[in-house]
Amino acid sequence: MILEHVLVLSAYLFLIGLYGLITSRNMVRALMCLELILNAVNMNFVTFSDFFDNSQLKGDIFCIFVIAIAAAEAAIGLAIVSSIYRNRKSTRINQSTLLNK
């Protein structure tokens, strides 16, 4: 694939995730948009690693590291969301003041 096509696709994914993160009022949707942003960044890592240096796997290894961190972030985020839902019966961001106290 041409480098520009992949970068444009990655930019679209990043912007969709950023728009969803800014406008979403649901915590689960915000976590999904954050994962979309991280996947767009991973796509850039793999693309630049393949385009600039085929012999080394630094971009691919860093991508795997980011995927592992994103999985841990998603698990912790969903645990926090389920705890807030159990206590408040809502997953709306603007109604949750549990962390302010």
UniProtKB/Swiss-Prot annotation:
<keyword id="KW-1278">Translocase</keyword>
<dbReference type="GO" id="GO:0019684">
    <property type="term" value="P:photosynthesis, light reaction"/>
</dbReference>
<dbReference type="Pfam" id="PF00420">
    <property type="entry name" value="Oxidored_q2"/>
</dbReference>
<keyword id="KW-0793">Thylakoid</keyword>
<keyword id="KW-0812">Transmembrane</keyword>
<comment type="subunit">
    <text>NDH is composed of at least 16 different subunits, 5 of which are encoded in the nucleus.</text>
</comment>
<dbReference type="GO" id="GO:0009535">
    <property type="term" value="C:chloroplast thylakoid membrane"/>
</dbReference>
<dbReference type="GO" id="GO:0042773">
    <property type="term" value="P:ATP synthesis coupled electron transport"/>
</dbReference>
<dbReference type="InterPro" id="IPR039428">
    <property type="entry name" value="NUOK/Mnh_C1-like"/>
</dbReference>
<feature type="transmembrane region" description="Helical">
    <location>
        <begin position="32"/>
        <end position="52"/>
    </location>
</feature>
<dbReference type="GO" id="GO:0016655">
    <property type="term" value="F:oxidoreductase activity, acting on NAD(P)H, quinone or similar compound as acceptor"/>
</dbReference>
<keyword id="KW-0618">Plastoquinone</keyword>
<keyword id="KW-0520">NAD</keyword>
<keyword id="KW-0472">Membrane</keyword>
<comment type="function">
    <text>NDH shuttles electrons from NAD(P)H:plastoquinone, via FMN and iron-sulfur (Fe-S) centers, to quinones in the photosynthetic chain and possibly in a chloroplast respiratory chain. The immediate electron acceptor for the enzyme in this species is believed to be plastoquinone. Couples the redox reaction to proton translocation, and thus conserves the redox energy in a proton gradient.</text>
</comment>
<dbReference type="GO" id="GO:0048038">
    <property type="term" value="F:quinone binding"/>
</dbReference>
<feature type="transmembrane region" description="Helical">
    <location>
        <begin position="2"/>
        <end position="22"/>
    </location>
</feature>
<keyword id="KW-0813">Transport</keyword>
<keyword id="KW-0874">Quinone</keyword>
<dbReference type="GO" id="GO:0030964">
    <property type="term" value="C:NADH dehydrogenase complex"/>
</dbReference>
<keyword id="KW-0934">Plastid</keyword>
<keyword id="KW-0150">Chloroplast</keyword>
<comment type="similarity">
    <text>Belongs to the complex I subunit 4L family.</text>
</comment>
<feature type="transmembrane region" description="Helical">
    <location>
        <begin position="61"/>
        <end position="81"/>
    </location>
</feature>
<keyword id="KW-0521">NADP</keyword>
<keyword id="KW-1133">Transmembrane helix</keyword>
<dbReference type="InterPro" id="IPR001133">
    <property type="entry name" value="NADH_UbQ_OxRdtase_chain4L/K"/>
</dbReference>
<protein>
    <recommendedName>
        <fullName>NAD(P)H-quinone oxidoreductase subunit 4L, chloroplastic</fullName>
        <ecNumber>7.1.1.-</ecNumber>
    </recommendedName>
</protein>
